[in-house]
């Protein structure tokens, strides 16, 4: 959401010329791809799969962990607002993505070319300021103006997990360990992102404050229509949409928005005084974004909202607690002599490594591959066991 808002704001500042040929769906898919690239890099760096130690050039210039740490140090020393005036972090991220895709061969750094569609720079060339159909090896990049504050929030959205404190109170930020992250948990991250999509507002919307699972974006005209039905009906409607109590909603509706807060509303409304006048009676209901600005979505803006991609694509990642027993009981008769014959488990005999390697396992509806991942784990363990038994039999 932070990245899409930043890209849309940059597009607006350039008279909608930067993303003229990019649909909201493509914009959301590109943001989703950026987030999954970052997850991949965090995992690879924390597990030391990218050779940063023998090549300090990577750690100093390309590492997403380093970029995050440097930005946080600057924000703590000088305030996050300073980061809004700098744009180098986004260019460093794009360079890291290119390095993973195309590789780096130099005296001071060596990274093999991993390729793959996830990191392909030509998949979303507009992120680099290039036109569709151009190639990254020939066309000069002119990266979109994504400021360092946006990049910091992108990185920390993945690195920090908000944990509820027992007994109430504000949530505490806990750092995620990507070293210990299972592939299934990465699947859950992807699955959660598919719960949303991007749309272009055909009229003004407001993002309302609500409970954790209820922070809707609603057309301003619909809110005005509901408000015209009377206080009781309006409160009932807001309670259903936001999950907040009627007493809390009454307090929010009575809030007077003045001074700096009013100025920020005007900024969010693109200095449209007529729009601000319509928003003002409802301003207390509006939530703030990551930068402290009210979520006002003027006509023509792209915004993130609940989507149906996850449901329509059938993307529901199966947890390991289910894949482990299902894979075990499915494959045991294939890797052991005994289960199919009805022998007790104590009499089962593991087949030879040659027989195990000859097995072909297929999941016809593999989806995100949770069962195949677990099948690979299970077969790898049995194969190691078979090799060890063969070694013991023929020392």
Give the positions of each predicted feature.
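Preference for the N-terminal adenyl/adenosyl cofactor-binding alpha/beta module
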Residues: 1-381, 392
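Cysteine-dependent PTP/DSP-like catalytic domain, specifically the C-terminal lobe
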Residues: 385-395
């Amino acid at each position: 959401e932070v990245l899409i808002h930043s890209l849309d704001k940059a597009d607006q500042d350039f008279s909608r010329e930067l993303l003229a040929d990019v649909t909201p769906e493509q914009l959301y898919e590109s943001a989703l791809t950026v987030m999954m690239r970052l997850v991949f890099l965090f995992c690879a760096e924390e597990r030391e799969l990218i050779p940063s130690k023998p090549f300090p050039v990577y750690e100093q210039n390309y590492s997403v962990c380093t970029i995050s740490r440097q930005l946080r140090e600057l924000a703590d020393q000088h305030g996050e607002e300073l980061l809004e005036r700098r744009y180098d972090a986004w260019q460093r991220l794009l360079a890291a993505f290119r390095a993973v895709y195309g590789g780096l061969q130099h005296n001071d750094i060596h990274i093999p070319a991993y390729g793959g569609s996830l990191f392909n720079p030509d998949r979303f060339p507009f992120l680099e300021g290039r036109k569709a159909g151009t190639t990254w090896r020939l066309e000069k990049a002119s990266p979109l103006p994504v400021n360092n504050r946006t990049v910091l929030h992108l990185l920390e959205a993945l690195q920090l997990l908000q944990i509820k404190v027992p007994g109430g109170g504000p949530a505490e930020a806990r750092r995620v360990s990507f070293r210990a992250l299972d592939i299934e948990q990465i699947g859950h991250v992807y699955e959660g992102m598919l719960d949303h999509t991007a749309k272009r507002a055909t009229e003004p919307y407001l993002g309302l404050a609500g409970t954790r699972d209820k922070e809707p974006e609603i057309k301003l005209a619909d809110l005005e229509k509901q408000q015209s039905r009377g206080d009781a009906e309006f409160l009932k409607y807001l309670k259903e949409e936001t999950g907040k109590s009627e007493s809390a909603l009454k307090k929010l509706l009575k809030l007077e928005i003045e001074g700096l807060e009013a100025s920020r509303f005007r900024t969010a409304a693109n200095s449209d005084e007529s729009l601000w006048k319509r928003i003002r009676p409802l301003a207390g209901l509006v939530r703030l974004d990551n930068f402290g600005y009210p979520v006002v979505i003027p006509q023509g803006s792209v915004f993130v909202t609940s989507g149906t991609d996850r449901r329509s694509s059938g993307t529901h990642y199966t947890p390991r607690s289910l894949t482990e027993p299902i894979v075990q009981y499915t494959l045991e008769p294939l890797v052991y002599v005994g289960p199919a014959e009805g022998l007790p488990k104590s009499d089962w005999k593991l087949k030879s490594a040659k027989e195990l390697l000859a097995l072909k396992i297929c999941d016809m509806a593999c989806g995100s591959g949770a069962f195949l991942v677990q099948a690979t784990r299970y077969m790898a363990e049995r194969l190691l066991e078979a090799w060890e038994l063969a070694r013991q039999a023929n020392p």
